């Protein structure tokens, strides 16, 4: 009795020591159990007067965080809770042992303090859920969150898919239904993996696509991102790869991933003007400034009507908050894929919503990519190659101006074919031209072209492309006047040497000028204008030579450079050369003239400046030693090999001595008429090459060209052999002309233009000037050897032996093309250089060809 009274009134007196000890032990046990189970610990003083409150405070209200249980009332930091499968149910009663209290309390004493304090009565808690229930609950939560994210991602993916004008509606509906049915995580991840692989396929620059697929299949996303960046990087920003690789944890990796994506886009975007990295940054603060509104509007649309570009506002592509990151990320990925795709539409496949390949290779697909909004209407069209509309007329004027120089080159090169006949006639010429002197009249021009090719490389670097071409006009006039007024063979040889020197310079500088001024979209067409005009010059020379003697023909040659000289004053220097000399403002004006006043030339100008900076860093003091490096020898040797087989096919011997060959053949057709026919075929074949060169491919045309030349040369050799040693072939007078026509046709579509085209495609940028000079000089050396020795070959081997020798060389050239020459059709210059020497080139290289007349 006394014990109960003392407990009720005392504040912790010594008379109630047993109960105090019991409560202390109870506190220790509760604290220890709470720590083991991960419960919150609340410090509270236990005493005999506040036993109920203390117990109610210490015990957790909800040990299991399930949705059906009310949330905790205490806002302390939540620690990770561990739910053990064998965890015993928590209850108050089992924690008190009988020996802890000397005087056991009654049932009323056990319940009264708690009720008096106003607290809830402690009852045994329900048993904890089993491990199966815990897993089911967690799966429901994850599926709920992932389902929302899945729907957002699918909607975003629908809004940023790639479409083409050729669309299979049936397959589209089927794939859309399949995508809608893929509502679980596994299906979405599987389709997303396919989308990533397909996207990597369209933009892979480094040929490591197999690694990408393998890594992605193994779910190593960090390594996949780093590897993919290496395959796409066109600016040497390898530090971005290290940004991912050096991440010490997944948290750090995800933390730096946005920065990586934004910076990677800047390193990959060839148009520079895109600000899509702001999509990943999740910030719109920069777009709020009025001063930058103009920067968000870029000319990135090019429909079929290129005269009506569309200006769009890139603010629509920016993310307003971090919550929009996942949604906007799909748009960013699609935009980046469009901006970095260098394989053009015929290399892409039509894709469904999830990026899976739908069917056939769309070889002739529309050359631009559309983003489709959710309502199916085009939101944005991006034409890959450039950001400016094609202002075609100024570029046509520039191409025509330099092509008139090619016409002069063609006329000068073909001059000896009709002129030597009248020059050797003593009734027309006041001086005697021996057979040996005649061979030098024909052979000294390519020898001088060799010297001009060597001098042309330094001249175009120091004087400029335009000024170098312009400087050849007056010497062309002087050389023709020297020949026209010649009173001896020496004056003719001097005139031919001066003309050949100018031809060597022009053969190098004309393609360089066009390659640096014409936009890629029209470079193939305008780049063949020099070839066409060169062949026109050959035709003009043949036609005029049929009724003019050698002196009058030379006067005509002196008049042809006059329009060429006038038009060259109207066109600007190449922006690339201005940038190399630090004249930024002049480069901007030149670009404005070439691209049009309405075009935004700043991105292209900045790209030229970056290319020049890269070229300056890679430049060495001794360029010739650079040519001997292993990586550079391979493309140089291929270019030299093509030049060798081009000239030793005998083309210049055929052109130089066409009239003489037909006279020796005893053809019933007049020799001058035959030369005109050959000139017409040569001219027509040029346009056939224009139609086929970007459709059939380089190697296919080389195969066809080589086979045609081999057959015709062997047949022509057989005809001359039968004429000299065999049966009468006078009734086959049409056969030489037929063989010549097929021979010229085959040469003009293959071995005529392609060696010069591939010289600009496969030679590395940093050695382009020196390597092109070497290749040009080698070409003229071969030309000189062939033209100078052709008459000697005919004298020693006979006409049949000379043609059979050329045919055998062409046959060997066929195997050279099969084994060593790469196919460059449809590939960017970066892809070609990576394949040839494992390096990516910055600047746009030359992709033009020397006219057939340059081969003389």
From Swiss-Prot:
Membrane topology note: Multi-pass membrane protein
Region (Disordered): 1-29, 62-202, 326-345
GO cellular component terms listed in the entry, alphabetical order: plasma membrane
One of the protein's GO biological processes: D-glucose transmembrane transport
Protein function: Low-capacity facilitative transporter for trehalose. Does not transport maltose, sucrose or lactose. Mediates the bidirectional transfer of trehalose. Responsible for the transport of trehalose synthesized in the fat body and the incorporation of trehalose into other tissues that require a carbon source, thereby regulating trehalose levels in the hemolymph.
Family classification: Belongs to the major facilitator superfamily. Sugar transporter (TC 2.A.1.1) family. Trehalose transporter subfamily.
Name of the protein described by the UniProt record: Facilitated trehalose transporter Tret1
Organism this protein belongs to: Drosophila yakuba
Designated gene of the protein: Tret1
